[in-house]
């Protein structure tokens, strides 16, 4: 079911999310469906969006959903960085559509997680995907891209047209 995306300023976006527990697994299929439906609706509306974090729809759990060529579910992910190489880029967010933020991200990352079937997984990420998962992972810790702006002049407004 499509859920409301929490917007910049909502206090829930700044909370640290709890682990998905054994008792939570019964709710996981519904949560994943809600994340999927919400992401697809955002794509239809704005023509963009590749991933969403559970806290963005009010679920304070360590759960990420990404849809590229197929769906990816990351339960209780852990993100690490194999080296210190970083780069700057313009970042946006479903929680503040139209606002762009210049941030610094690691060029490479490794994410370890459980999938939607409780199987362990690991992905090495580089460039665009590394940045995407760092952005979504930050949501689990109550960190927004606006908090990672490289300086106080790194916020830009961008008008997005609604796809009709």
Give a label for each model feature.
Residues 1-164:
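Positively charged
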């Amino acid at each position: 079911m499509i859920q409301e995306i929490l917007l910049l300023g909502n206090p829930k976006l700044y909370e640290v999310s709890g682990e998905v527990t054994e008792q939570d697994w019964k709710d996981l299929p519904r949560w994943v469906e809600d994340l999927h439906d919400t992401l697809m609706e955002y794509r239809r509306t704005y023509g963009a969006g590749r991933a969403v974090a559970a806290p963005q729809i009010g679920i304070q759990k360590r759960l990420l959903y990404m849809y590229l060529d197929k769906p990816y579910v990351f339960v209780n992910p852990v993100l690490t960085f194999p080296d210190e190489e970083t780069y700057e880029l313009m970042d946006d967010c479903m929680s503040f559509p139209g606002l762009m933020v210049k941030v610094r991200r690691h060029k490479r990352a490794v994410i370890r997680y459980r999938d939607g079937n409780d199987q362990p997984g690991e992905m090495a990420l580089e460039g665009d995907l590394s940045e995407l998962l760092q952005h979504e992972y930050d949501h689990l810790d109550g960190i927004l891209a606006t908090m990672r702006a490289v300086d106080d002049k790194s916020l830009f407004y961008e008008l997005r047209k609604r796809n009709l």
